[in-house]
Amino acid sequence: MLKYAAAAPAGLGLGTGLLALAPPRADAAPLGILLDYAAGVIGAGDLRASGALGAIRYVSDRRPGGAWMLGKPIQLPEARDLYQNGLKIVSCYQYGKQDTADWLGGQNAGVAHAKRGWQLHVAAGGSNGAPIYASIDDNPSYDQYKSQAAPYLRGWEAVLGHQRVGVYANARTIDWALQDGLGSYFWQHNWGSPQGFTHPAAHLHQVEIDKRNVGGIGVDINQILKPRFGQWD
């Protein structure tokens, strides 16, 4: 297991070890690091020792064939552990993937998934004002965006309201969502995004996937770009 914090000199602030290892942004220094993961639950001690400020956690069920996703969904004891140890929590939602991706179902799917996501968010102790990041974990064409992804996000907004919907997507899809007034928070992934580009509207940016472990669990690294990034209150 890689101990990120060991790479940072003593006395440096929380998150410095991960910041030193994460790919740099050309436009501004990140405000810290969040980890996202699905294969298990990482305790607050291990998460803090990694140098992360907190975690982006799933408020979605395991999909068929996803028995390995032992960390989905976040449960109240885990959330209490993180919160009581001063770590930040952000909610995200993704059930299907690839041919079963949630957004392929359009608005009706958005409504159904938003309802389930909110149930799990509340059950884990998520705050009423915090958003859930709905996932567009793909590189959709403009036609796919207009016919499926945008209606999917509208379904989310119909349930949660505009202010509580975040969008996990590539830079191009974030741009389209902004043009359509969809989503209040944005978490960028790099599939289909221009190399080295960070969308200026992004609150979070996923900069590394499937390369490191914390507490024996595979993690992705995300840079915090804005002071309010959808964290639970």
Predicted regions: what is each one?
Residues 2-22:
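N-terminal export signals
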Residues 23-27:
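Sec/Tat signal peptide C-region and signal peptidase I cleavage site
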Residues 33, 37-42, 57-144, 150:
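Substrate-binding cleft of extracellular glycoside hydrolase catalytic domains
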Residues 48, 83-84, 157, 161:
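Anion (oxyanion) recognition and catalysis
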Residues 145-163:
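Long, well-ordered alpha-helical scaffolding segments within enzyme catalytic domains
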Residues 162-175:
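Aromatic-lined carbohydrate-recognition surfaces of secreted/lumenal glycan-active proteins
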